[in-house]
Amino acid sequence: MEVTYRIDKDILYIAVEGRVDASNAAQAEEKIFAIKIANPGKHVVLDADRLEYISSAGLRVILRLRKEEPKLAIINVAFDVYEVFDMTGFTDMVTIEKAYPKMSVEGCEFIAKGANGAVYRYDAETILKTYFAKDALPEIKQERENARKAFVLGINTAIPYGIVRVGDSYGTVTELLNAESVTQLIRNNPNDLSVAAKYYIDMLKSIHAIEVEDGEVPDMKETALAWADFVAPHLPEAQGKKLRALIEAVPKRNTLMHGDYHTNNIMVQNGEPLLIDMDTLCMGHPVFELGSMFNAFIGYSELDHQVTVNFYGYSHETAEKFWDIALKAYLGTEDESVCQNVAEKAMIIGYTRMLRRALRRPNEPESPAKIARCKEMLELLLNKVDALTF
């Protein structure tokens, strides 16, 4: 029997390995409480990933721990051990989570990645999405709930049917037969983006055609106002006030939006586009969606074009071209002046978000250049744009 621990933010994970029975329960208790005392103020979670067996003596140790930790949780519990907890009533007293099946991405085809994870083809019928954060379970559960909501609302989306362990983190499994991402379509034919753009915009329009109830998803206007309030002290006073006033003047809309709409997040199956990443669902005026799209294709990689290559696998020039084609398709016009006018409105949202992000990461080597660029562009755009609506 071994007892080890690790700390992640405010959580103290105590791992118990092997068998805990009458012969070593006292020793296990001594080690567990010593770790707890040495790390005060932490929420205790028992990690049973390698716990093979627990007897009544071991259960009494958990009862004593629970008296001091009313919110005690036990995770990664094997089937046989879970049966013991269930039969003895512990599942009614303590939050106990079963162990998830283990999968590996070794040898799997890489499809795409986003801010929070990466997507792989596990086999001909299965897509595996991995999450970068070790404590991604709440995020995964929220994304599954968002996917369910979107599906009920009529959006063609892939709903994960299983949670798995991938290394030290988690993943979700989705059945997607013969599917490829819009990113792959672009990489395969960067000289003709028409097919990829049609899938991309058809899906976007289907999302924006849906109205949701207040409180069903976050309101993006409120989020954007928070961005403006954060960056305003770093701008000339008149610019900071105008930025907030422009966002404040955007009328409330209950239009459903994706919130992170880029080509890695759309798959094509049997000639139909479908979404695979749903953790950023929100609502509001489409200018907020277009702002995030501008960042995804141009803003985030404006000062370093290799960012586009690393994220999508196609060039920054291709991303710029795709943004232009997609915007025209979304607006339903080839008029350059109309499209530029709307693009500038979206850019104000995009640069505001990027400026906040860079200001919050002052120690990153790229931040000073990003801050300077965002300020420069916001000054230019705020002198030209008098409304964000279109």
Stretch-by-stretch model annotation:
Residues 1-30, 48-50:
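STAS-typified acidic loop motif
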Residues 22-94:
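Amphipathic alpha-helical interaction surfaces in cytosolic regulatory modules
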Residues 100-106:
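Juxta-kinase regulatory segment immediately upstream of eukaryotic protein kinase catalytic domains
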Residues 109-215, 251:
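ATP-binding pocket architecture of kinase catalytic cores
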Residues 209-259, 263, 269:
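An alpha-helical support segment within catalytic cores of ATP-dependent transferases
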Residues 277-281:
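Activation of the activation-loop gatekeeper triad in protein kinase-fold domains
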Residues 290-334, 348-364:
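Active-site activation/catalytic loop segments of kinase-like enzymes and analogous catalytic loops
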Residues 337, 352-390:
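ATP/Mg2+ or Mg2+-diphosphate-binding catalytic cores
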